[in-house]
Design a protein with these regions (language model features):
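Glycine-rich phosphate-binding loop of nucleotide-binding enzymes
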Residues: 1
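Sequence/structural signature of beta-propeller domains
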Residues: 4-5, 11-457
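Perimembrane helix-loop junctions in membrane proteins
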Residues: 16, 488-489
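Extracellular Ser/Thr-rich, low-complexity/disordered mucin-like segments
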Residues: 452-469
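A cross-kingdom C-terminal cell-surface attachment/processing module
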Residues: 467-488
Length: 492
């Protein structure tokens, strides 16, 4: 959702040093993008747009091109009133590898009414070879989430919003609505493939952090990957200890890992939640979050796993998510059921703090990236409990950065300017989609010689609503399944 509209005239800086951190923090590794140099002025290598070509900043060696503009056919760059045109207000996105030629597909939501999802098909050399729709006639498709079995979950951010499962290589005819995931203003989702759970953020001012846990009957085998049907299971909300029943934690309350529990929520047959989350009193359930935004699952490499203070096993799977109303980035340690704020403006000394954090993505090498909803229009690398780094900024303002997603090898990053210049002459404000190339030296994952402790036993049984879930497949199998499917600028 776009809120800020004031134009930014020059790159805004994320500088300074972090204040003293709490002694107890989740042991989260840092990826190579934490070491990027300062940004510099960029000229688009393809798809130059008047009014934007001189407003893009990224580090040296990171090339930027425009790959699609609203109202134009992405292949021809021309209007196609009787053919396919790139959609209005591009938002959340993801990338899927193609097995037949080594290429990939980037999918992008349309946060409009009617909304939907568009797809851009690239070959192995990064050439755009096709563009098409995979979901139509929905409402305000904001963000969503990628599944390990190769589908895209598109979220409607509206009252009574639903989640729709789409095939990136298919069409609108193959999309399926999933009411069991609840009917509320969905923002984004992420799948925990180890424990068969779908985590969800809810947009708004006083919302909840959700998960759907599949029953055994909801699971099936899909080319060696356990697939969640997302139709039979339990819907739950998270409660941070001491902040149950609509409680709201201040930043200082969660800068070190805090224990959580999960409370089951009842829904009707249409997915409507049978309690109003906006009533934050004793009738509600769960901890209150200030506007849930992007979310992404990351599995820490085995050699880098460590046991956190307050935990019993090494941290393995982590859900990173953002809350816009208070500009926080959170990390939830699934195995240890601990949650922590890993970034917030109040705890970091910077000249220009986060401006409405929104979409979240984690690179294949473990870098956590956040896109901003506000007018500063930045893509920022979040260093857990450390200093953020500016990766990209479009200083034109009047829009927001959306849909960041990496190719599986981490060599390319896609994103959109939701209200960026559109149309043949760039005079429109319907949105544009871009690609950044990532140099190889910033794609190498961190390594460690020995892990701290044993890999957690994912076959242990649940221990109540707050306990571990049933065992499943490893996250790496999901990537194989996808492949099997047809801040400071340098002086100018």
């Amino acid at each position: 959702m776009f809120i800020g509209a004031a134009a930014a005239s020059s790159p805004q800086v994320l500088i300074g040093r972090a204040q003293a951190q709490m002694a107890s923090e989740l042991p989260l590794p840092v990826g190579p993008l934490a070491n990027i140099p300062d940004v510099e002025h960029k000229t688009l290598t393809a798809g130059a747009i008047d009014g934007v070509d001189d407003e893009v900043f990224a580090p040296p060696g990171f090339d930027v091109r425009c790959v699609a503009r609203e109202g134009l056919n992405p292949l021809t760059g021309e209007s196609a009133p009787f053919g396919y045109e790139w959609h209005l207000d591009p938002d959340g996105g993801a990338v899927y590898p193609a097995a037949d030629d080594g290429g990939w597909v980037y999918v992008s939501n349309s946060e409009d009414t009617p909304g939907g999802v568009g797809a851009l098909r690239f070959d192995a050399d990064g050439n755009l070879i096709d563009a098409y729709s995979i979901l139509e006639d929905t409402r305000n498709n904001c963000a969503g989430g990628q599944t390990p079995w190769g589908t895209w979950l598109s979220c409607e951010e509206t009252t009574g919003g639903q989640v729709h499962e789409c095939d990136p290589f298919g069409s609108d005819a193959t999309a399926v609505r999933k009411p069991a995931l609840g009917s509320f203003p969905h923002e984004a989702v992420a799948i925990d493939p180890i424990h068969h759970a779908c985590y969800m953020t809810e947009d708004g001012g006083n919302q909840r952090f959700w998960r759907f846990v599949s029953d055994e009957s909801d699971l099936s085998d899909d080319n060696g990957v356990t697939r969640m049907g997302l139709e039979s299971g339990t819907l739950q909300v998270l409660s941070i200890q001491g902040f149950e029943d609509g409680g709201y934690p201040e930043a200082a309350d969660a800068r070190s890992p805090q224990p959580v529990t999960w409370e089951t929520v009842d829904i009707d047959t249409s997915g409507r939640v049978l309690f109003p989350t906006f009533q934050n009193d004793e009738t509600t359930q769960g901890t209150r979050f200030a506007g849930g935004e992007g979310i992404w699952y990351y599995e820490i490499p085995e050699a880098l796993r460590q046991t956190p203070a307050g935990g019993s096993v090494p941290t393995r799977g982590v859900m990173f998510f953002a809350t816009k109303g208070d500009n926080r980035v959170w990390a939830y340690d699934i195995e240890n059921q601990l949650i922590e704020i890993i970034y917030d403006n109040d705890n970091m000394q910077m000249e220009t703090g986060f401006d409405q954090v929104d979409n979240v993505v984690v690179s294949p090498s473990g870098d956590v990236l956040v896109a901003e909803d506000g007018a500063l229009m930045r893509l920022v690398v979040v260093v857990p409990n450390g200093q953020a780094k500016l990766l990209m900024q479009i200083t034109k303002g009047g829009s927001e950065i959306t849909g960041p997603a990496f190719t599986p090898d981490g060599s390319r990053l896609y994103f959109s300017s939701q209200r960026g210049p559109s149309g043949a002459d760039g005079s429109g404000t319907g949105g544009a989609t871009f690609e950044i190339t990532i140099p190889e030296e910033y794609r190498t994952a961190p390594v460690a010689s020995t892990p701290d402790g044993e890999t957690p036993d994912t076959d242990r049984p649940p221990t109540g609503s707050a306990g571990a879930l049933t065992a499943a497949t490893v996250a790496g199998a999901g990537i194989a399944a996808l492949a099997n499917r047809a801040l400071r600028p340098a002086d100018e």
